[in-house]
Amino acid sequence: FSSLFKGREDVFAKRWYSKASGKSGYQPVCLHEWNRQFCNKKKYKCAQCPNRHFKNLEYEDIYKHLEGKDTDGCDVIGIYVVLDGNQCNFLCVDFDDKQCAHDYKNDVLVFVDVCKSWDIPCSIERSRSGNGAHVWIFFKEPLAAIKARKLGNAILTEAMNRDGRVSLKSYDRVFPSQDYLPEGGLGNLVALPLQGKARKNGNSVFVDETFTPFEEQWAYLLNVEKVSEPFIDEVLALHGLSSELGELSTTSESKPWEAPVAQKITNEDFPKEVVCVKSDMLYVSLVGLSGKVLNHIKRIASFKNPEFYAKQGMRLSTYNIPRIISCADILEEYVALPRGCEDVVVELLM
């Protein structure tokens, strides 16, 4: 278990839960917590506290996580993904119904389908809540976080080409979520699977492609394959993107009219006739459009978030700041775009 889900060992987080407010979250485990001589929660957050003294992750902590005796789930562990040297031991992509346009299971299966076609072994874990899933890819040796993220983004972009409904928000749910740790920061964390309490409800377990849990979870984990860095380099050389997140509309002030370049779209990707309705927005019918076309159309109204990249460049926290701002909205039968996209859409359809 520890050889697969390997994050930082000098610090880890535990879940907390407030019965009064019903809120929950994770915070690093500190040996000085509630010690009045050192701990001042009103003044400092745990990660920024000058008196912090984090507890090392030990087998006893993992055992309690797996046992799951705490009725409020406060024995659940979160591990910090990015190691010293900005490396990581795995890639984890989070899918849930909040971010997915149509059922997280569809997005998971499209992502897994890309992994299979690229010969990348991956594992599906149903989330603690049961309303989402994590897809894990494990590395044979620590890999640069920036390279792990490139792999995750390449798989996601191909998944979007195969099914245009896969949300652009998925780029924000790739862990590690940073290429480099912010100065003095701990980076993002991922909750460990096989949480004892959730497991009793059939959640936080590994499942097959029908989302049926494997009967022997430990036997499954013993046979999980890891990928090597040379193989990942081959995958990125073959499938890597000139643009990390695929083609998006530019945010350049000098050429704000430029649209993303259509990628390998042919007449076979379109029906004979495409219905467009101009109302409060521009509505383009989804009937007969291929996944590649839908993916391209939504990218016409999407661009990189300058706030995110400004903070990332200064090594500041980018928590809760999306990488991409998208003004496209995928409905049941149409994709809706701002009316200013009309000329570009018409040019694509001509």
Regions found by a protein language model. Give the residues of each.
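Long, charged low-complexity interaction segments
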Residues: 116, 121-122, 126, 237-270
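Short, hydrophobic/amphipathic alpha-helical patches that form generic packing surfaces
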Residues: 2-7, 191-194, 298-299
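DNA replication initiation modules
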Residues: 76-105, 140-256
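Signature for HUH/AEP ssDNA processing cores
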Residues: 2-131, 138-150, 154, 161
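A broadly conserved detector of short glycine/acidic/proline-rich loop/turn motifs that flank catalytic sites
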Residues: 5, 34, 194-198, 210-211, ...
